[in-house]
């Protein structure tokens, strides 16, 4: 029961942290002076790094080795982007932008693959969890316009689904599968 609560708390924290950063930082398509302030750099890197922990935790909830392995790709991409952001914006090493983009690409591809794995191999209500990586992809693509609210809704939904689905036994989940 404690693991269930911690998992749900992590999911809720990801959504709240991302939304909080998005509101405070007020991202734009233009480069801003605050973008390279250490507080913003570290906060943004921290929010990205949260995904590296949350995505594999989500995959464990779904179950199966394939889901977990695919989630590691997304987590590695998030970690790479997080570290690259510190060098790019914090230390003003502009060439590291390409490393940031590479990490973001791995993260997006991993999330896309995870969406497919959950949707096609998940059982019963656990298929609903495919909405979480899909929503995360949408939040990243629409980052400037609506990334914070989308991420908040996505990961709060993950927290609620984690609580709701974990109260069902595997036999109940199997019976609910069409």
Regions found by a protein language model. Give the residues of each.
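Hydrophobic, aromatic-enriched alpha-helical segments typical of multi-pass transmembrane helices
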Residues: 1-178
């Amino acid at each position: 029961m404690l693991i269930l609560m911690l998992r749900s708390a992590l999911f809720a924290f990801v959504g709240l942290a991302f939304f909080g950063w998005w509101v405070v930082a007020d991202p734009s398509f233009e480069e801003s002076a605050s973008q390279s302030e250490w507080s913003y750099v570290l906060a943004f890197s921290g929010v990205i790094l949260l995904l590296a922990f949350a995505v594999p935790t989500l995959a464990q909830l779904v179950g199966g080795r394939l889901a977990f392995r695919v989630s590691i790709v997304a987590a590695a991409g998030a970690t790479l982007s997080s570290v690259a952001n510190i060098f790019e914006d914090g230390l003003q090493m502009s060439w590291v932008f390409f490393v940031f983009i590479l990490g973001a690409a791995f993260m997006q591809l991993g999330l896309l693959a995870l969406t497919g794995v959950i949707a096609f191999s998940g059982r019963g209500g656990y298929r609903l969890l495919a909405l979480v990586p899909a929503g995360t992809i949408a939040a990243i693509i629409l980052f400037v316009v609506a990334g914070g609210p989308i991420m908040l809704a996505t990961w709060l939904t993950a927290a609620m689904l984690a609580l709701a689905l974990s109260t069902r036994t595997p036999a109940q989940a199997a019976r609910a599968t069409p």
